[in-house]
Amino acid sequence: MSRLFTFLCLSLLFNLAQAQLPTPEYKKGQAILSGTIANYNPDDNLIFKIGAPNIVMGTAETLYPTVEADGSFTINIPLYHSAQVRMIIGNADLVILLSPEKETNVTINLSNLPGKQFVYSGQYATINNEWCQPELITKIPPVYRDGDLLDSIAGISANEFKERCINQYKQYIAHNNTQSQFSEDTRTLANLSCAFDCLENLQATHYCLQTAYQKKENITREQAFAAFLDIHLPDDFHNYLKDFPVNHPLALYCYNYRNVVTNFLYDTHYDPLSMEKYLLENAPLTKEEQTLIHQYEAAFKAGVIFRQQNDLMTLIRKYTKERDDCNWKIFSEAKKRLGHILQDSTCLPVDYIRAIYMRSSLYNLQPLTSRQEIMASEITNPIFIGIIQDMNRQMQPRKKA
């Protein structure tokens, strides 16, 4: 036992020694991506775009590099911290690890075989070159977008679906861990990326099974929503989360960390009508507005298209206080729910839920509300804090000279 423990400790020390990446830190700046595209022809109208992520907003700013006639390009990419950015060029869709104020160069030849299409130098060259190799598994596709996968899960239970997802994830991690030709950092980031993609599928379990049912029965999306409205996940369904590396010190390098918390917020009884129900109970609605909501609920439950969707959205926007009250309730419960599963109210995923709560104002180019400021004050992660503070400053009214 003593020898085994010593071996495990030495293995851990070796892995730590091999790993070079530090924990990412907040540092707003411009990453520089330069490169050359072999055999470039301006008349080919090559698709070429970059996605610069904002982890708090869960979105990416789309940038279009200007390519010179000789195929060379240089683009500045705004980042809040070292992170993977997405690059789509031709039929290739990949991520590149970049840092603010650092330059990475890439030579692109799309006619080459996979693994040789992109050759990097500069910052994170080893990780970026290894990431492109076909022997490394770096992503798990969303089940709800794959027709064959949907066919394979039609009629199975939520727990069976969960088991499939987790087994697939474990197989991919086991495979990556045998690829000793790649650096520890590269394998760690690949495994984290697979974990976060798996979490997207697990959180979408109800929707995946619903979409599989829709495809099998050849019914409309509305009919499928109605059929699954009263079907819920087991109360302990999301306990798997404590076995995932959601609090890993390198997690925020990953482009897909946003998959760790989706719109479902780990709610086993997610209710797509929650906002409308809250307004009926708490907002001073007119009789016409009450009727509109009741008509929407009836249409939803009957599985038919609701023709007054724009009127409903206008109504929801009208009752700002009640809408904010409902969102505060939803996010407070989600924060508590995740903290209970992970037994830590200050861990990264719980902080991320707090950060996501800021989106409603920042999306609309508005400064944070008093409630959002209260929840923002609970955040401990420096990257989330830095992004929120920077964006909130930009939303403040400018003082007159």
Where does each model-flagged region fall?
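N-terminal start-of-domain structural block
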Residues: 3-4, 69-71, 323-330
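A non-transmembrane, solvent-exposed segment enriched in polar/low-complexity residues
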Residues: 20-189, 202
